[in-house]
């Protein structure tokens, strides 16, 4: 039932949303979410809200965990490495929710080089690795795929961010099998599927990725990629695609804190 949602309460009483599934006797929620691990504040340079504003809205929307993953220094206009080195001074709980503070690092080449040093990465609560046009120009299908597979070897990288951008042609079979081998999570990025997003062919690429994740039992996480507080936890497009594919609920890590715990660097 695309586009229709149910509300229910998590263990802490907060409201969660998910797709409605009906039978003759009951209604259950599919793809409910207690977390959003990919968001940005003003520190990223092209986002519009403070950390407090983001945390407050996340709490009001019923999330239990908010990941704040500022763009790493290779992205024009973002914060310096010193920002990430100093995250130790920021509390990990605000407005009753847990914060995972980290970075969306930029993959810089086919070797999987990223733009923060290991001594900084090892202190991050969560690390997303992504391809961005200002930081790495699209290469061949092999080169683009190798960039993902090599960054997966980095022990501090947890999530592969928006691997759905058709400007970077990749081998999705290799991507999914690599995620399984290295224990990484593939992101289903809601923003990628929005009509005004610059990423190309995202829905079709996400569909292919999800079918392979289903085949090989590889987990995914829905993320908003919010650059404004009201977009936190907005996963309607991602949920609808999951529903169309009848994607297994147990492979969507948003369902509970327990589900995501082993995939992030700071234990929650």
What are the residue ranges of the model-derived segments?
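Histidine/acidic-residue-rich catalytic or RNA/ligand-binding cores of hydrolases
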Residues: 45-48, 78, 169-176, 196-212, ...
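Extended recognition/assembly regions associated with phosphoester-bond processing machinery
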Residues: 26, 64-65, 77
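Alpha-helical scaffold segments that flank or form the walls of functional sites
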Residues: 52-66, 86-93
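Short acidic/histidine-rich active-site segments
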Residues: 71, 218-232
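Extended substrate/RNA-proximal surfaces in nucleic-acid metabolism proteins
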Residues: 30, 72, 77-188, 192, ...
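Mid-to-C-terminal alpha-helical segments outside catalytic/metal-binding sites
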Residues: 3-25, 233-268
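Histidine-centered catalytic micro-motifs
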Residues: 34-44, 68-71, 160-164, 224
């Amino acid at each position: 039932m695309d586009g229709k949602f149910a509300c229910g309460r998590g263990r802490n009483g907060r409201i969660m949303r998910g797709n409605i599934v009906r039978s003759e006797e009951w209604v259950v929620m599919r793809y409910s979410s207690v977390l959003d691990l990919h968001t940005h504040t003003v520190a990223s340079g092209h986002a519009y809200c403070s950390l407090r504003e983001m945390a407050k809205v996340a709490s009001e929307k019923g999330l239990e965990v908010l990941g704040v993953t500022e763009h790493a220094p290779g992205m024009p206009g973002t914060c310096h490495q010193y920002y990430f080195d100093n995250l130790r001074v920021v509390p990990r709980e605000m407005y009753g929710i847990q914060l995972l503070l980290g970075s969306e690092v930029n993959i810089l080449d086919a070797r999987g080089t990223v733009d923060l040093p290991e001594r900084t990465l090892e202190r991050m609560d969560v690390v997303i690795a992504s391809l961005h046009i200002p930081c790495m120009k699209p290469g061949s299908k092999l080169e683009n795929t190798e960039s993902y597979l090599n960054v997966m070897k980095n022990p501090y990288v947890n999530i592969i961010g928006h691997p759905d951008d058709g400007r970077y042609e990749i081998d999705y079979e290799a991507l999914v099998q690599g995620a399984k081998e290295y224990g990484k999570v593939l992101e289903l990025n809601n923003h990628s599927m929005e009509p005004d997003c610059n990423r190309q062919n995202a829905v079709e690429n996400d569909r292919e990725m999800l079918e392979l994740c289903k085949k090989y039992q590889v987990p995914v996480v829905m993320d908003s990629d919010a650059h404004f507080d009201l977009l936190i936890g907005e996963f309607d497009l991602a949920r609808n695609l999951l529903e169309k594919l009848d994607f297994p609920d147990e492979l969507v890590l948003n369902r509970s804190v327990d589900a995501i715990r082993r995939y992030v660097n700071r234990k929650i």
